[in-house]
Regions:
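C-terminal catalytic-base region of ester-bond hydrolases, centering on the histidine
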Residues: 130-206
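Serine-dependent carboxylesterase/thioesterase catalytic core
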Residues: 4-9, 14, 18, 22-24, ...
Length: 206
């Protein structure tokens, strides 16, 4: 089984190598895809995913933050079979858009986001209707810019994305962990949960 991994905003594929390494230790093939998150060329990213998918085994798509939204757009465009792509796991992904992005736009500093809001980060209503099983992982350690920009410390978040924003109607399972938005991809909890979700179709809540 092969896992294709996409990073989030302001990141490079190198940031996902520790997660990739941990997943390889579980016996998976992995491929990390790098793309320009501020000047997203959707078709080029989709072509990279096409090339990364193995025709000889089942594939899994894993995305951190914006990467999960790129995966959702990929499924909508390419509509791969469940035999080709069986599972999707999002890590800290605002699957229906991010309120912090709306706030940044209100403040008139949205140039820092490049064209990323046009690729899923704007708030939108949606539900998961793809054949692939979707597992969503959320952080609950509010370390990040959200507290300064949003002034909503009472809302459970990872410091960037709220827990509620990581949920979508139709998802298969959802789990929380005390991590910040960035540290989600560096702990040992996430790769173990990815493996559990792939193998059993649910997260390990024990």
């Amino acid at each position: 089984m092969k896992i294709i991994i996409l990073h989030g905003l302001y990141m490079h594929g190198l940031a996902m190598q520790p997660l990739s390494h941990k997943l390889r230790s579980f016996g998976y093939q992995t491929k990390v895809i790098t793309y320009n998150t501020l000047a997203i060329e959707k078709n080029r990213v989709f072509e990279k995913i096409d090339q990364a998918l193995s025709p000889d085994t089942t594939n899994v798509l894993v995305g951190h933050s914006l990467g999960g939204l790129i995966i959702k757009a990929y499924l909508d465009k390419r509509k791969p079979s469940q035999q080709m792509v069986s599972h999707v796991i999002t890590i800290g992904t605002p699957i229906k858009g991010a309120s912090i992005v709306h706030r940044i736009q209100e403040l008139g500093i949205d140039a820092i986001l490049g064209n990323s809001p046009e690729h899923g980060l704007k708030m939108h209503h949606d539900k998961w209707e793809f054949t692939q099983k979707l597992g969503c992982i959320a952080g609950t350690l509010p370390v990040g810019a959200r507290a300064l920009l949003m002034m909503d410390r009472s809302i459970l978040s990872d410091g960037t994305v709220t827990v509620e924003e990581t949920m979508i109607e139709g998802m298969t399972d959802h789990i929380q962990t005390p991590s910040s938005h960035t540290s989600l991809i560096y702990n040992s909890f996430v790769p173990k949960q990815i493996d559990h979700f792939i193998q059993l179709g649910c997260f390990d809540c024990s």
